[in-house]
């Protein structure tokens, strides 16, 4: 099928939304500014749940839907995404540290799995162009070593490479890292994929509200979840909170910010994030695991 939609001006976009589709708007200048700075297509993901079919088969906004309501949804998503990214960054730094520590202890400073060396070499080569500590190592020790030691290479490795490295190191190293984080190896291996996808979504400003995640977190049996979808953002938030609680004292302040966000935007509704009623009494939020 040929794509038929064509470019239209900002003024025409405003007219289409308000007159054509029935969006309530008290300030056209604000609507124009949002269309200019955020974009019609990006915003359409936030107004989609507010639309319905008209009698002639066209999609229009449900009666009473306002531009302010849609922008509150957008702002909720933006702030939730920032909270998630902050937490994933902490977890990623912890993972770099512990993976390097246990792998080097088990196999030596340069004991990389053969199946990971090609990818590590590519990232090492890229890092030599911009990272001073990598340049120093290459200039000083490059005649003897084609890669830097574990504790150095993990600092320039992508999340995808860390995920690969975890899957290839010795079983005892995988167990040590996963045990530090309070889960079994198969669960943490899945969670690494979840963290990578979440990190990428946050970095690229992708929507976390009303999202079905392509990689769904495995829920530990000990959590005893029943009837709760693990493909929604609530499941990802639960994984993040569990991991934060294992690595330091950031979990409760982060949770406080999350609960404040939920309260400030309670008119948005938490169903699109997958938050069930009574979630505070569920593991890991009850902290009873």
Task: Report each predicted region and the residues it spans.
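Extended intrinsically disordered or low-complexity regions, especially N/C-terminal cytosolic tails and loops
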Residues: 1-198, 209-289
